[in-house]
Amino acid sequence: MPRRVLQGVVISSKADKTVTVKVERKFKHPIYKKFVKVSKKYAAHDSENKYQEGDKVSIIESRPISKTKTWIVVNGE
């Protein structure tokens, strides 16, 4: 099964080797037929402490690194 890749924005980089990434997605509500925007936060591993708040990054699914981290930052802008 291929690993999932998500794009989002770094909203916190205060922890050592960890960033919090906010991923937004849009979908059409099945009953009301309105587009709804939903966001979710992921803790991602940043081994070089390279990314700061506001950076756009891609994260990839991986094995569990800690209790909450199962994503790794692969590249950013």
UniProtKB/Swiss-Prot annotation:
One Pfam family here: Ribosomal_S17
Alphabetic keyword roster: Ribonucleoprotein, Ribosomal protein, RNA-binding, rRNA-binding
GO molecular function, one term: structural constituent of ribosome
A cellular-component GO term for this protein: cytosolic small ribosomal subunit
Domain of life: Bacteria
InterPro entries in alphabetical order: NA-bd_OB-fold, Ribosomal_uS17, Ribosomal_uS17_bact/chlr, Ribosomal_uS17_CS
Entry similarity comment: Belongs to the universal ribosomal protein uS17 family.
Protein name: Small ribosomal subunit protein uS17
Species the sequence originates in: Rickettsia akari (strain Hartford)
